[in-house]
Amino acid sequence: MRNLTRNRSLVAGASVIALLVIMGISQSVLERTAAAQNKGAVQAPRFEVDPLWPKPLPNHWILGSTIGVWVDTDDHVWIIHRSTATLGNNEKTLETKQGECCAGAPPILEFDQEGNLLRHWGGPGQGYEWPDSNHGIFIDYKGNVWIGGNGAPDSHILKFTKDGKFLLQVGKKGARRKEGASAGNQEGQVAGFVGGSNDPVSFGRVAKIFVDAKANEAYVADGYLNKRVAVLDADSGKIKRFWGAYGNKPDDTPLPPYNPSNPPAQQFYNPVHCADMSVDRLIYVCDRVGDRLQVFTPEGKFVKEQWYEKNTLNAGSVWDIAFSKDAQQKYIFMADGVNEKVKIIDRQTLEELTTFGDGGRYPGQFYGVHSIAIDSKGNLYTTETYEGKRIQRFLYKGMAPVTKMNQGVVWPARSTR
């Protein structure tokens, strides 16, 4: 009987060993198969939200609608927001002396890589006209800070030092005012103001500025009222050239509401929301409401275009872009503030490879993701407008095979300890 029991134990043990061997072989085969499949799969950058960046602001400060972000050559992160103007009464009781919290932070904030607040400034001052509704921020190769504005009378841009010293105003506030003018049907068109897309001096509610170091030229996404890209001398502010969609002469004739079934509009919709230059000196223009990205030479010659989430209506899908930090800038990262995602795009083909994010309030989710920027390590920074009112950092985690079109919310992996 003992021998029978022992034999059964030996058989059982051998079976377990055989099973483990089979499982090991199967696992090895699966791993090799997956590796082979991944080897031929499309690769894309992978990200993970950093829920602890930045650090809390001092003085009970909070952010309003946050509508611009840029990373300077020191890897410092700059944002611009609308502060008190976009805070509800229950959010700013410190200002109204009705409670201890909170107050709107100054409009322009600078953070280091650890999330510490380094500098803060902005607002009305002598010698310049602060925008009614500031919009977009850029730090140029000389360390100067550029901002635009999309308030009703904002037809100018401003340049400051990093410490907030005023340097230059281009354009005159209120230049687009025309008594009796009716409101248009697109975002930014307000009664009493008309477009001036062929104006050689002033703008029409500028969304964003990009400065080309090689030519010392500023590219202006102009804008929420005008329908053009304007290029100016970055020192004098003199406008040198401008163009509309497809390189056409800009035309301020109101467009019908965007309809994806209609032929492509031959002018930009409002707003023209970005105009950024790549390393090979191509200008990528965000036609936000038109759901399209158009590409031009620096002289305004049309090169190509692509649509994204083409059936997106209202505020559109193409809000802002940033280029990857490899030498060829292989990828474009695009903020989509209606569908609440960041798109990862092959820059050469303009093909969308994958997306991450979703609507919501938790880390890694978005509410009105508006602007996007990248640091030297490849980390992404996004800001949110409307009631989003925040900046988020997404850490670059290397390249990975694309296994699905939408990665969802890219939270950090939970610890197994």
What do these predicted ranges mean?
Residues 1-7:
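N-terminal secretory signal peptides that target proteins for export/translocation
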Residues 7-417:
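Eukaryotic scaffold repeat domains enriched in small/polar residues
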